[in-house]
Design a protein with these regions (language model features):
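Active-site glycine/GP-rich loop and adjacent strand/helix microenvironment
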Residues: 1-194
């Protein structure tokens, strides 16, 4: 991996934070990704964790992109939409059609039109991530699919894995289907995973 000094960093780019001794004798990866918001003085925000990403097809989707796309879609709705919890996983081998990203969302107040809402999120994702855009336009992936999780579905999921509590959080994105396969049993009846 390429190492950057503070003088080389650019604003708005994700970097992995490495702690080092002044002489560089050892380095430690703390697992966070950061973005610089200012260079004079240097200011950063934590933009995610390096283990939380989706890249099943080379798209390199990170948590901050997913959260921002979802926030944009919610803000663009004419009616109030509130989301209790969500996670995203790749669907690599669907029964029919191209693979896609599968969004499991538990709504307190769902959107009026779930398909339109999904298209808004997908368009925001394409605008945020050029690799995702290339895979959609190149017909390697189809646009994302939303699965509505029943009320308390995520809470029940966390309880079944023994991690219910304030310090435990559902990962926003995962590069595998471990969480998704369990959440399928907590879907609203109108969902039909394919």
């Amino acid at each position: 991996p390429q190492i950057h000094t503070l003088e080389e960093v650019e604003l708005g780019i994700n970097y992995v934070l490495i702690i080092s001794t002044t002489a560089g004798l050892w380095r430690y990866n703390i697992g966070d990704t950061i973005q610089f918001t200012s260079r004079f003085p240097f200011k950063v925000i934590v933009s995610g964790r390096i283990k939380h990403f989706i890249s099943a097809f080379g798209e390199h989707v990170i948590v901050s992109e997913v959260e921002q796309a979802l926030q944009q879609a919610v803000a663009s709705e004419r009616t109030e939409v509130t989301i209790r919890e969500f996670t995203v996983a790749p669907q690599v081998k669907p029964n029919t059609g191209l693979p896609y990203h599968e969004w499991f969302i538990e709504f307190d107040q769902p959107p009026a039109d779930l398909n339109t809402f999904a298209l808004k999120i997908d368009q925001a994702m394409q605008n945020k991530n050029i690799y995702y855009n290339d895979l959609i336009t190149g017909k390697v992936l189809r646009p994302l699919v939303i699965r509505m999780v029943a009320k308390d579905g995520f809470k029940n999921y966390m309880k079944t894995i023994g991690k219910l509590g304030g310090q435990n959080k559902v990962p926003r994105v995962s590069d595998n289907r471990k969480i998704a396969e369990v959440l399928i049993s907590y879907l609203e009846p109108l969902n039909d995973p394919k």
